[in-house]
A protein has these predicted regions:
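Hydrophobic alpha-helical segments at protein termini of multi-pass membrane proteins
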Residues: 1-234
Length: 234
């Protein structure tokens, strides 16, 4: 993943006016072992405008679109049984949780030493994946039964939006963390610290909201299925 991002970033940088000179300088520096051992050099590369734009496009735009589709694949493969709404929700939640587990094992984009922040990212990210996949799975179930694509499209858009907001906040924290390492005490450090705090508060609120949304959706689906069951028996 890191290699792919580097290739994309270099390709984008080559299109900028000064991109060729920056690439030549980077290739020269990569041949120096001392330059490679200095973490500040990697931070400077990540903060280059072409690299930042590439990271935002990949993690905030492309990743949500692709991953929300990928999480629907297991549900679609099992849909030959034409699941009920509650069953589709459970399948979606399980697909999202499984995806989050794999992502947590291999995701090394943001290395954080604070245990509470790590737990927030893991719990919030897993909840986001589960809710998004659950909503999309219910949209898929509605499409199979009623042949109306609008609910599926709407659920997919909601899932992608939630995913993009979460990833945007995480990428923002990563960028602010890199900026903070190169700033000295003063207004600049205060601004970066305040920005990181605001994004952390946003992630906390998102996590609480995502958990509440899963509880609410589960309750509503159960109520709908109970109503249908009572109508079928009368």
């Amino acid at each position: 993943m890191a290699g792919l991002l580097l290739i994309i970033a270099v390709s984008v940088a080559a299109l900028t006016p000064s991109g060729r000179a920056q690439i030549d300088e980077l290739l020269t520096n990569l041949q120096s072992p001392l330059w490679l051992e200095d973490p500040a050099n990697l931070e400077r590369i990540l903060l280059l405008p072409p690299v930042l734009v590439t990271l935002i496009l990949v993690f905030v735009v492309l990743a949500p679109i692709i991953e929300e589709l990928a999480k629907l694949i297991p549900v679609a493969l099992m849909s030959y049984r034409l699941p009920a709404l509650g069953q589709a929700l459970v399948w979606g939640l399980a697909s999202g949780a499984g995806f989050a587990l794999v992502e947590n094992l291999f995701n090394t984009l943001l290395a954080v030493d604070i245990w509470a922040v790590v737990m927030l990212l893991r719990i919030g990210g897993s909840t986001m994946h589960a809710l998004g996949a659950g909503l999309t799975a219910m949209g898929w179930q509605s499409f199979l039964r009623n042949r109306r694509p609008w609910k599926l499209l709407g659920a997919y858009i909601v899932a992608v939006t939630l995913h993009a907001v979460w990833n945007g906040a995480v990428v923002g924290i990563a960028g602010i963390s890199l900026l903070a390492t190169g700033t000295t005490a003063g207004p600049a450090q205060f601004i970066t610290g305040a920005g990181a705090l605001i994004l952390l508060v946003l992630l906390v609120l998102l996590t609480v909201g995502l958990i509440a949304a899963i509880v609410f959706v589960t309750y509503r689906v159960r109520a709908v299925e109970d109503t249908r069951s009572s109508q079928a028996t009368t």
